[in-house]
Amino acid sequence: MNQPSHRDHLRRLPESAYCGHAVVHWTLTIRERRTGWLSAEFYYHFRELLTHSQFRYAIACPILCLMPDHIHLMWLGLLTCSNQKLAMRHLRTRCNESLRRIGFEFQDQPYDHVLREEERQELTFVASCEYIARNPERAGLVGVDEYATYPFTGCLVPGYPELKPFESDYWTRFDRTVAWLRKNGLISGQQMNE
């Protein structure tokens, strides 16, 4: 039997589904689901690379979780010009450069789930983010209801390092921040003078 000479690719929605204020749950898997790459050093390097991709393409990440063999990211576009496919390509290229230095790389394509309108409603959206945050719990890396202690979970909104996903007022502050950024953009004179 002949084997295909090319790798199968995941089907994607139309380009427009990943643009503007789209909300997408991305999963990036290490090739062959190998482990051994995740460390505190890599986590902070990943956050640096993620910051550049998110700022460049106007993306916010209310929850991220690096697991031993894969990464979960919930992204939402901040501006009408936001493009998550370009942001993901940018991030994967930079991350793969770093991963290859230590003998790892991502699988060819990330998995994505573009959230439908009903999945973007506040309670459902927050529940989806909590599901991502509880990955370490389901994997037995932390105890039941100890997912907030997992050291490789966080959030990233460019310009707002003070946001912490497990603080009691997080979602109120996150929503206010995203609304402000959508209205005023990532850089404004007011921000620069504060």
What are the roles of these predicted feature ranges?
Residues M1-E194:
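Short catalytic/metal-binding and nucleic-acid-binding patches
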